Amino acid sequence: MRRSLQRSNQHHKKALQKLPLGVSSNFRYWGEDKTIYIDHGKGGRLWDIDGNEYIDYRMGYGPGILGYADSRVDEAAHKGMEMGGVFALSTKLEYEVASRISKMVPAAELVRFSNSGTEAVMAALRLARAHTGKDAHIIVEGGYHGVFDSVLWYADIEEWDAAKGDPPIEADSEGIPHILKKLAHFTPLNDANYLEDLLKRHHQDIGAFLIEPMMGNCCSITASPEYVHAARELCEKYNVVMIVDEVKTGFRVAKGGVQELMGFKADLCTFAKAVGNGYPISVVAGREDIMRRIGDGVIHGGTYTCHSVSLSAAAKTLEILDETDALQTIENYGAALQQGMSRILEARGIAHSFVGHPSMGGLFFNSTPPGNYRDWLDSDYSFYDTMAPELHDLGVLCEPDSREPWFICEAHAKDDSLPQTLKAFEQAIDTTLETMD
């Protein structure tokens, strides 16, 4: 049975009068008759303005690590509200939260706060340039690092002829200065030889290597530990700052993030999504000698940085993640969900694999998991694209684009989300098979 989006569709027409695309982020626009407007969220569930209830596996693209409207975090945020909000001065709480982050992430010797992942990566890139005196940077193909000009580029490999050299670099958006193109270089994930060749040719210009070891906007495709350690050595060899973007993986895949899982330390690292369980806060952290450049030539700031509400929420969220078994609960649920999905798919002879970590896993309809963005691009993802809307009608909300992982929160494990999800998944798979037959 198709759910009704009548009220969402009506509101969308009204919203178009004041908001481009009717929304406040391009990624929230799903089409004229498919864009959803939310009434409220609680735990691992959302309710839209039509009254449809969803088990949510987007979780705001990852921030909801504990669940929506978590009483523990919201009570702390309320106390933060009573502090007063924005002072353009500092509070003792900043030191306390920074100390917690340094405890959980050894690479985070010094910490600075911002409000979004984009801001954190901007700061990291500025620090890397200041530290090395080199302006260019490397981005891993398929990686996502926010919506600022320096990183809104991609390697156009769809029509690329490898015999003609490196793939052309194109802008993701209009309005980006073309002069910035010469500062962006790209490398495929899990190919250390390619990375080394790129550095041999351009190391005199490259000051930063930006990497998501688990690509949060590309099916959670994951770097091998061997690749990460090889990249670490190459960065040291060629005087390149290794920036590990943990905006999505940080405080989710492990207390110490993906760096803990793979046993290495970044020069600089960024965090955002899970830090405050949905309250706006982000982090740039790293080696003391690099971070000390802030105030010694490098500018970093922001009026709303360390708002008392967000900082209080972060303090409580990180306390829960550090001192309880919340992350293990999340991982166990994600593993059980994937096992249940596998049973359903195997019973129907559907080749598949899961990528990444159970807390933010990608579903890939091929028996061989992708090792980089090129593998995903060469795959047939039409089955996923057909399945996702069927799941939405059955009350399970995943991203319509297969590149976005399934995000798990602690609250999913506290109700009957798992059996409900698997029942809906089985129905959606059968409907998709009939549709594509």
Language model feature labels by segment:
Residues 1-437:
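Conserved N-terminal phosphate-binding loop of PLP-dependent enzymes in the Aspartate aminotransferase
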